Swiss-Prot record:
Residues 220-224, 423-437, 923-933, 995-1036, 1093-1105 are lumenal. This is Probable cation-transporting ATPase 13A4. The active site is at residue 487. PROSITE patterns: ATPASE_E1_E2. It is a multi-pass membrane protein. Residues 33-53 dip into the membrane without crossing it. The gene is Atp13a4. The chain crosses the membrane at residues 199-219, 225-245, 402-422, 438-458, 902-922, 934-954, 974-994, 1037-1057, 1072-1092, 1106-1126. GO terms for cellular component: early endosome membrane; endoplasmic reticulum membrane; late endosome membrane; recycling endosome membrane. It catalyses: ATP + H2O = ADP + phosphate + H(+). Belongs to the cation transport ATPase (P-type) (TC 3.A.3) family. Type V subfamily. Expressed in brain and stomach. Keywords: ATP-binding, Endosome, Magnesium, Membrane, Metal-binding, Nucleotide-binding, Translocase, Transmembrane, Transmembrane helix.
Length: 1193
C-alpha cells in the first residue's frame, strides 16, 4: 500500500543506518474510528486483538493516508527482511510558555543559526514543535526540509572551530531551557515494567489465545480435567516467563539508573560554573571535569585538557584509554572528518569512567555535551538489548508452515465431521462442537513450546560450562556453523606479551640482539628512553595502570614512574604530569628523567602512538612506537637499515610480536599544544625493534584440530603483522603441514598506474635462526609442480582486502573460498569480512576477546566473546573461560539442540495425527474418546515424554557433517509421512478387524463373563453368562481398540524418534526418559491385561478376550518394528541419501559450494607469481539470496 503513496506521504527514517525504516503519514478519521469501535463491540473484542497482532491493519482501518506534514499518526516499517510494522502518534510541544520568560519570539528565536535542527523544527508563528518517539529516540519535524530528523545530538556538520566558538563558553539559560524541552531529559530510563503489563502482553500471545479457545471448548464438553491441567501448565509457563522478563527488566534498570542521577558541573554563559543534575544536560552544554573516578552521564567532546578513561563497558577492553582535546582548527570541515585518526579519541562516552582528568596549565578540563539520553553510546547499547534484531531462523519459519499444513488437515477433518454428524441427525450444537474438537486435536497447542525445550536444556548445560547466552534462539544456529573466525591476540595466543629482547640500530645497521633473559641491564640511550616514556600508562593511587604491553615494556627498562607537576617547573606542564626516571639499578644515565607533556594516543587505524617529553634540564623530544612498517615510513630513509625487511621477517616468522621505535628532537620555541601531529611525526630517527613473545594458548591447537577434523573452516582475523599471523596459523594447525600459503598483495592506483594485485607463494625453509622453521616469498618465475594443488590458503592484509573490495571485487569470493589468514585488519574490516563470508552462504561464528571485535561479534551469526565486560552484550554468547574451548562446546550443544527440536517436532506431529486418525475413525460410528481417555494420552503419556525426551546431552565428539537445518527437508518429511501412514494403516486394520470378531455384538458392550473365556468358546456358546452393561456413551469395542493402539503407539513413537548419535548422547543415557517409558509401558500393559471393572468404567473401556488383547499388542509391535526399521535403514542412512542425491544429480545451491566446484575445474586457479591490473570496472559480487535474506538464518 505504501508503495503507491506520494513522496510527501512516504520517507525513510535513519536512511542508510542499521535500523532504517520506512515512514508513512496518516490522519485519523472520525467515521472510520467509530466503525472500528462498533466492530470491536460486535466482535466481542476480537477486532482489537487482531489490531494488536497487526498494527498496520489498525492504522489502515482508523486513518486515511496524508502527507507527513499533516499526519497525526505515522506507520513505520523496517526495511530489513522482516518488514515489521509499528505505529506512533505525532506529539506536539508548545514553546509559548517560554516565550514570555525567555524572550523567545517568532521573528527572533534565541537559537539564531538557521543550520541548527532545533531552530528549523520550531513552527512559526505559534512556536510549536512536532515529534515522534521511536525506540526511545525523538525525531522532530524539520519544517524546512520536510522530514523527521533525530534530535538529541550536536549536528554532524559542525567543525571543530564552530564547536569551540559556539559552545566553548557554554549555553545561556534560555538556550538550555529550549533544548531541554525539545531534546528531552538526559536519562537512559528503563522503567521496570509492571507485572500486569507483562502479564497482559504474554496472555495476548496467539499461542495462549488458541489455548483459551481450546479450554473454553473443553469446558463446554465437560472435559474439565484436561482443561484445568492445561490452565495450570499455562499459568506456570506464563508465571515463569513473566518472572524472567521482570528480572531482566529490574536488572537492566539497575544497570543504567546510576547514570541518571549524577551531579555535574556545567558552565553557563552568564552565570558561570554551577552544579546541575545530569538529567538536565542538553547537547551543547559545557562540562567542567574535576577530580578522578567520574562517571560520564552523556557523550561529550573533550575540548580542553586530557583524560584517562576506562571504556570497558563499551569495548570490553579493561585497558585505560587516553583522550585528547579536539584542536581548534580554522576549517569548515566537519570535526569527525577533520581528525586524521579515529574521532573517538576526542570523545568521552556515557557510562565510561574518567579515571584521571588533567588540565592544561592552570585551566580546567572542559568538554562539550555531544549526545544525551538514548542517543549516547551507552544508550545505543541499552537499546540493542531492549529492541534486539529478530531471529529469522528457518526452523521457526518451517514450524509455522507445518502448522498451517496441520490447519489444512484439520479443515478436511472438520468437513468430514460435519458430513458424518449431519447425516446421522445429530443436534447442530453437537455437530459444531465435534467439528471444533478436530482443530484442537490436529493442531497441537504445545508444538511451538515443544520446539524450544531442547534450547532451554542446552542453555542450562552451557551455563554449567561457564558459557552464558543472552539470545537462546542462537543456540540452534550454533548447530549450523561451518566457518569460525578467530581473533589472534588474546584468543588464539596468550593475552600477555613478555619482552624477549631489543634489536638496536645505528648508522651501521642493526646491532646485536639484547636478550632480556640474560639479566643484563638495557643500554641507556634514546632507545631505552623511548621504551620508558612512549606509552599511555598512568599512576593511580601509587599503582601503575594501563596496557599490559606498555607495562611490560616499561618494566623492562627498570625505570620508575612518579606523578609531579610542582617540583619540575617545566613550562606547559599539566597537573599531575607523569615523570619517568632511571633508578639506581641502571647505572649512569644521560638524563635525570623525562616528563611526558603530551600524547598522541595509539589508534588501531593509525597503528602507532607518539609522545612529547621534556628532559629535566634539557630539550624536548618526540618518541614514536608502533607497527614496524608504519614507524619506518615516518623515519628519515637513511636511518632505516637496509636489512629492515629481512630482519623484521626473522622475528615475525617465529611468531614474535615486533614493535618499532623512533624519535626526533623538537624545537623549544613552539608551545606543545600548538604542535600538529603531522609535524611531530616526520623526519624521525629509527631506533630499533622491540621483540615480544606471544605464545599460543595450550588449548588452541587441539581445539582447531577438532574443528578442522569436523570439516568446519577456521579463519584468523587479526590486527597483527602478516608474517606473525602466518606463523601462528602454521603452529596452531590452522594451516596444516604440507599445505601452501599464497600471499595476496593488492595496491591502490597511484597516478597513471592502475590498482594491482599480485600472488606470491610463501614457502618454508629449515632450519630458521632459532631452530624453528622460517618462511620466505617465492619470487621465482617457474612454479613448482605441486604449486597448484588444491591444498592451499590465501593470506592477505587489511590494506589488500580494502583494495580488492574496491577494485577487484569480482575476485573477492574466489579469494574468500580459500582465505584463511587476514592480518592488519581494522575493526570495521573485521565486520566487513564476516559479512562477505555470509554472502557466500556460510554460517559464520566469530570468537574474540571483545577488545576490537564487537562489530564482528555482532555481525556474525554466532558471536562468542571471551570478555566478561559489559560489552559482551554485543555478543550472543560469553565465555567465562578465556580460551577457545567454548567454540566446540557451543557447536556440539547447538547440534544437539537442533536435533532435539526436530525430534520434538516429529513426535508432536505424530501424536496429534495419531489422535486425529483415531477420533475420525470413531466419528464414523458417531463415537469418540472419552475425557479420561484423552486425559491419559495428553497428560500421562505426551506431557511426560515432552518434558524428558529432550534431556539427552550433546555427543562429546564432533562429526564431520551437520544436522539438517530445516524441518521441511526430504528425510524428515518422509519420516513423518511414513509414520503417519503406518499409524493410519494400523488404526484402520484394528478398526475393521474388531468388527469382524465373532464376539462383536452391537447390543452388548462387554464379552467378559465372570471368568474370561476364549474367543472360540464364546463363538460355540451363544448363551453367555450375564454380562455387565456399561452406562457410558463412549464405551465400545472400537473405542477400546483404537485407544489402546493410539496410547501405546505414542510411547513407541517417542522411542523411535528419540535420536542419539551422532549429534546427541545415546538414548539409554537419558535415564529419566527411559524410566518414564518403562513406567508408561508397564501401566498401559497393566490396563490392557488386568480385568478390573472399576478401572474399565473410569476409562470407558470394555473388557475384551485375552486373545484380542494379544492381537492389539502384535499390531502395535509390528508397527513399532517397521517404524524403527524404516527410521534406521532409510531415514538415518546418510550413505543412502548421498547416493540418492548423486543419482538425481543434486548439488548444493550454497554459494560457497558453487564457487568450490567452479574453482576445482579451473586449472589456472590459483594464479602464482603473477600481477594483474584493475580495469577500473570493479564489478561487485552480489548474492540475491543473501540480499533478501530469505534463507540466511
Amino acid at each position: 500500500m505504501g508503495d503507491h503513496l506520494e513522496k510527501s506521504q512516504h520517507a525513510l527514517l535513519n536512511e542508510g543506518d542499521e535500523n532504517e525504516m520506512e515512514i508513512f503519514g496518516y490522519r485519523t478519521q472520525g467515521c472510520r474510528k467509530a466503525l472500528c469501535l462498533i466492530g470491536s463491540i460486535f466482535s466481542l473484542g476480537m477486532l482489537p486483538l487482531v489490531f494488536y497482532w497487526r498494527p498496520a491493519w489498525r492504522v489502515w482501518a482508523n486513518c486515511v493516508p496524508c502527507s507527513l506534514q499533516e499526519a497525526d499518526v505515522v506507520l513505520l516499517k523496517t526495511t530489513d527482511e522482516f518488514k515489521i510494522y509499528s505505529w506512533k502518534k505525532v506529539i506536539w510541544i508548545s514553546l509559548s510558555a517560554l516565550s514570555s520568560t525567555s524572550g523567545l519570539t517568532p521573528d527572533h528565536p534565541l537559537i539564531t543559526d538557521e543550520g541548527y535542527i532545533i531552530n528549523r523544527a520550531i513552527r512559526k508563528p505559534d512556536l510549536k514543535v512536532r515529534y515522534i518517539k521511536v525506540q526511545k529516540i525523538r525525531y522532530v519535524w524539520n519544517n524546512l526540509e520536510g522530514q523527521f530528523q533525530k534530535i538529541g545530538s550536536l549536528e554532524d556538520w559542525l567543525s571543530s572551530a564552530k564547536i569551540h566558538q559556539k559552545f566553548g563558553l557554554g549555553l545561556t539559560s534560555e538556550e538550555q531551557e529550549i533544548r531541554r524541552l525539545i531534546c528531552g531529559p538526559n536519562a537512559i530510563d528503563v522503567e521496570i515494567t509492571p507485572i500486569w503489563k507483562l502479564l497482559i502482553k504474554e496472555v495476548l500471545n496467539p499461542f495462549y489465545i488458541f489455548q483459551l479457545f481450546s479450554v473454553c471448548l473443553w469446558f463446554s464438553e465437560d472435559y474439565k480435567e484436561y482443561a484445568l491441567a492445561i490452565i495450570l501448565m499455562s499459568v506456570i509457563s506464563i508465571a515463569l516467563t513473566v518472572y524472567d522478563l521482570r528480572q531482566q527488566s529490574v536488572k537492566l534498570h539497575h544497570l543504567v539508573e546510576s547514570h541518571n542521577s549524577i551531579t555535574v558541573s556545567v558552565y553557563e554563559r552568564k552565570a558561570g560554573a554551577q552544579d546541575l543534575e545530569s538529567r538536565l544536560l542538553v547537547p551543547g552544554d559545557l562540562l567542567i571535569l574535576t577530580g578522578s573516578r567520574v562517571q560520564m552521564p552523556c557523550d561529550a567532546i573533550l575540548i580542553d585538557g586530557s583524560c584517562v578513561v576506562d571504556e570497558g563497558m563499551l569495548t570490553g577492553e579493561s585497558i585505560p584509554v587516553t583522550k585528547t582535546p579536539l584542536s581548534q582548527t580554522a576549517s569548515s570541515v566537519p570535526w569527525k572528518m577533520q581528525s586524521e585518526a579515529d574521532p573517538r579519541r576526542h570523545v568521552l562516552f556515557c557510562g565510561t569512567e574518567v579515571i584521571q582528568a588533567k588540565a592544561a596549565g592552570s585551566g580546567a578540563v572542559r568538554a562539550v555535551v555531544l549526545q544525551t539520553g538514548f542517543n549516547t553510546a551507552k544508550g545505543d547499547l541499552v537499546r540493542s538489548i531492549l529492541y534486539p534484531k529478530p531471529m529469522n531462523f528457518k526452523l521457526y519459519r518451517d514450524a509455522i508452515r507445518f502448522l498451517l499444513c496441520l490447519v489444512g488437515t484439520a479443515t478436511i477433518g472438520m468437513v468430514y465431521t460435519l458430513c458424518v454428524y449431519v447425516l446421522s441427525g445429530e443436534p447442530p450444537e453437537e455437530v459444531v462442537r465435534k467439528a471444533l474438537d478436530v482443530i484442537t486435536i490436529a493442531v497441537p497447542p504445545a508444538l511451538p513450546a515443544a520446539l524450544t525445550t531442547g534450547i532451554i536444556y542446552a542453555q542450562r548445560r552451557l551455563k554449567k560450562k561457564g558459557i552464558f547466552c543472552i539470545s537462546p534462539q542462537r543456540i540452534n544456529v550454533c548447530g549450523q556453523l561451518n566457518l569460525v573466525c578467530f581473533d589472534k591476540t588474546g584468543t588464539l595466543t596468550r593475552g600477555g606479551l613478555d619482552p624477549w629482547g631489543v634489536v638496536p640500530c645505528d648508522q651501521n645497521g642493526f646491532q646485536a640482539v639484547h636478550s632480556f633473559a640474560s639479566g643484563k641491564a638495557l643500554p641507556q640511550g634514546p632507545l631505552c628512553a623511548a621504551m620508558a616514556s612512549c606509552h599511555s600508562l598512568i599512576l593511580l593511587d601509587g599503582t601503575i595502570q594501563g596496557d599490559p604491553l606498555d607495562l611490560k615494556m616499561f618494566e623492562a627498562t627498570k625505570w620508575e614512574m612518579t606523578a609531579s607537576g610542582d617540583d619540575l617547573h617545566i613550562k606547559e606542564m599539566l597537573a599531575h604530569t607523569i615523570v619517568v626516571k632511571p633508578t639506581d639499578m641502571v647505572g649512569q644515565v644521560p638524563a635525570e628523567g623525562l616528563a611526558i607533556v603530551h600524547q598522541f594516543p595509539f589508534s588501531s587505524a593509525l597503528q602507532r602512538m607518539t609522545v612529547i617529553v621534556q628532559e629535566m634540564g634539557g630539550g624536548r623530544l618526540a618518541f614514536m612506537k608502533g607497527a614496524p612498517e608504519r614507524v619506518a615510513s615516518f623515519c628519515q630513509p637513511d636511518t632505516v637499515p637496509t636489512s629492515f625487511i629481512s630482519e623484521l621477517q626473522i622475528y615475525t616468522t617465529q611468531g614474535f610480536r615486533v614493535i618499532a621505535l623512533a624519535y626526533k628532537k623538537l624545537e623549544m620555541d613552539c608551545p606543545t599544544t600548538a604542535l600538529m601531529r603531522e609535524k611531530v611525526e616526520s623526519d624521525l630517527v629509527f631506533l630499533g625493534l622491540l621483540i615480544l613473545e606471544n605464545r599460543l594458548k595450550e588449548e588452541t591447537k587441539p581445539v582447531l584440530e577438532e574443528l578442522i577434523s569436523a570439516r568446519i573452516r577456521t579463519v584468523m582475523i587479526t590486527g597483527d603483522n602478516l608474517q606473525t599471523a602466518i606463523t601462528v596459523a602454521r603452529k596452531s594447525g590452522m594451516v596444516s603441514e604440507g599445505q601452501k600459503v599464497i600471499l595476496v598483495e593488492a595496491n591502490e592506483a597511484t597516478g597513471s598506474s592502475s590498482a594491482s594485485i599480485s600472488w606470491k607463494l610463501v614457502e618454508e625453509k629449515k632450519p630458521g635462526p632459532f631452530g624453528s622453521q622460517d618462511t620466505y616469498i617465492n619470487i621465482r618465475e617457474e612454479v613448482p609442480e605441486n604449486g597448484r594443488d588444491r591444498s592451499y590458503h590465501f593470506a592477505l592484509s587489511g590494506k589488500s582486502f580494502h583494495v580488492i573490495s574496491q577494485y577487484f571485487s569480482s575476485l573477492l569470493p574466489k579469494i574468500l573460498i580459500n582465505g584463511t589468514i587476514f592480518a592488519r585488519m581494522s575493526p570495521g574490516q573485521k565486520s566487513s569480512l564476516v559479512e562477505e563470508f555470509q554472502k557466500l552462504d556460510y554460517f559464520v561464528g566469530m570468537c574474540g576477546d571483545g577488545a576490537n571485535d564487537c562489530g564482528a561479534l555482532k555481525m556474525a551469526h554466532v558471536g562468542i566473546s571471551l570478555s566478561e565486560q559489559e560489552a559482551s552484550v554485543a555478543s550472543p554468547f560469553t565465555s567465562k573461560t578465556p580460551n577457545i574451548e567454548c567454540v566446540p562446546h557451543l557447536i556440539k550443544e547447538g547440534r544437539a539442540a537442533l536435533v532435539t527440536s526436530f525430534c520434538m517436532f516429529k513426535y508432536m506431529a505424530l501424536y496429534s495425527m495419531i489422535q486425529y486418525v483415531g477420533v475420525l475413525l470413531l466419528y464414523w460410528k458417531t463415537n469418540s474418546l472419552s475425557n479420561y481417555q484423552f486425559l491419559f494420552q495428553d497428560l500421562a503419556i505426551t506431557t511426560l515424554i515432552g518434558v524428558t525426551m529432550n534431556l539427552n546431552g550433546a555427543n562429546p565428539k564432533l562429526v564431520p557433517f551437520r544436522p539438517a537445518g530445516r524441518l521441511i527437508s526430504p528425510p524428515l518429511l518422509l519420516s513423518v509421512v511414513l509414520n503417519i501412514l503406518l499409524s493410519l494403516a494400523m488404526h484402520i486394520v484394528g478398526f475393521i478387524l474388531v468388527q469382524k470378531q465373532p464376539w462383536y455384538i452391537m447390543d452388548y458392550h462387554s464379552v467378559c463373563p465372570v471368568r474370561n473365556e476364549s474367543a472360540s468358546a464364546l463363538a460355540a456358546s451363544p448363551s453367555v453368562p450375564e454380562k455387565t452393561r456399561s452406562n457410558s456413551t463412549f464405551a465400545s469395542f472400537e473405542n477400546t481398540t483404537i485407544w489402546f493402539l493410539g496410547t501405546i503407539n505414542c510411547i513407541f513413537v517417542a522411542l523411535v524418534f528419540s535420536k542419539g548419535k551422532p549429534f546427541r548422547q545415546p538414548t539409554y543415557t537419558n535415564y529419566i526418559f527411559v524410566l518414564v517409558l518403562i513406567l508408561q509401558m508397564g501401566v498401559c500393559l497393566f490396563i490392557l491385561f488386568a480385568d478390573i471393572p472399576e478401572m474399565h468404567r473410569r476409562l470407558d473401556l470394555l473388557c475384551t478376550p485375552v486373545l484380542w488383547r494379544v492381537y492389539i499388542l502384535i499390531m502395535i509391535s509390528s508397527n513399532f518394528v517397521v517404524s524403527l526399521a524404516v527410521e534406521k535403514a532409510i531415514i538415518e542412512n546418510r550413505a543412502l541419501w548421498i547416493a540418492v542425491k548423486r543419482c538425481f544429480g543434486y548439488q548444493s545451491k550454497s554459494q560457497y559450494r558453487i564457487w568450490q566446484r567452479n574453482l576445482a575445474n579451473d586449472s589456472s586457479w590459483p594464479p602464482l607469481n603473477q600481477t594483474s591490473y584493475s580495469d577500473m570496472q570493479g564489478v561487485s559480487y552480489s548474492n540475491p539470496v543473501f540480499e533478501s535474506n530469505e534463507e540466511q538464518l
